[in-house]
Structure formats: C-alpha cells, structure tokens
C-alpha cells in the first residue's frame, strides 16, 4: 500500500507541472509573436529574463509576470 500511495503522490505533481508548462508556453508564445510582428523585419533582439522560470508558475501568475516584464523589457531594433 505504501508503494501505491507513493506512486500516486509522485504522479500528481508531475501532472500539475506539465499543465503549467503548457500554459506558460502559450502565454510566452503569444507575447513573443506580437513583439515579432512589430519589429520582426528589423532583426532586433528581445530579452526575456524570466522565460525559463515561467514554466514553473501557473497561468494566472504568468500573465501578471509577462505584463510586468513587458514594461521593463528592452527593445533593440535596427530600423526606425
């Protein structure tokens, strides 16, 4: 019985982490897509300092973090 309960407790966090990683990819993909439309042809670079950490956080927190990062994000574009 202890082995079964251990497997159940291990599988539950794995399911929640996979859900949060999928949702964070969607959020970051949308924000990066909108930025690339604005400056995609300029060959500019965009910095996402916390992009790797967003996969751990839930979708609601990701939206808040992405909005906060967009205010401090530095854009560098070659064409003005």
Swiss-Prot record:
InterPro entries, sorted: HssA/B-like_chaperone (IPR050533), HssA/B-related (IPR008455)
Domain of life of the native organism: Eukaryota
Encoding gene per record: hssl2
Record field: compositional bias (Low complexity): 9-29
Transmembrane intervals: none
Entry-linked Pfam families: Coiled (PF05710)
Residue ranges the record marks as coiled coil: none
Cysteine pairs bridged by disulfides in the record: none
Name of the protein this chain belongs to: HssA/B-like protein 2
Organism from which the protein derives: Dictyostelium discoideum (Social amoeba)
GO biological process: sorocarp development
Disordered, as annotated region: 1-29
Annotated family: Belongs to the hssA/B family.
């Amino acid at each position: 019985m202890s082995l079964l309960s251990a497997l159940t407790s291990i599988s539950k966090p794995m399911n929640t982490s996979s859900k949060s990683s999928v949702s964070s990819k969607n959020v970051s993909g949308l924000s990066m897509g909108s930025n690339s439309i604005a400056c995609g042809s300029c060959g500019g670079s965009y910095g996402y300092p916390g992009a790797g950490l967003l996969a751990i956080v839930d979708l609601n927190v990701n939206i808040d973090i992405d909005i906060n990062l967009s205010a401090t994000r530095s854009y560098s574009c070659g064409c003005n």
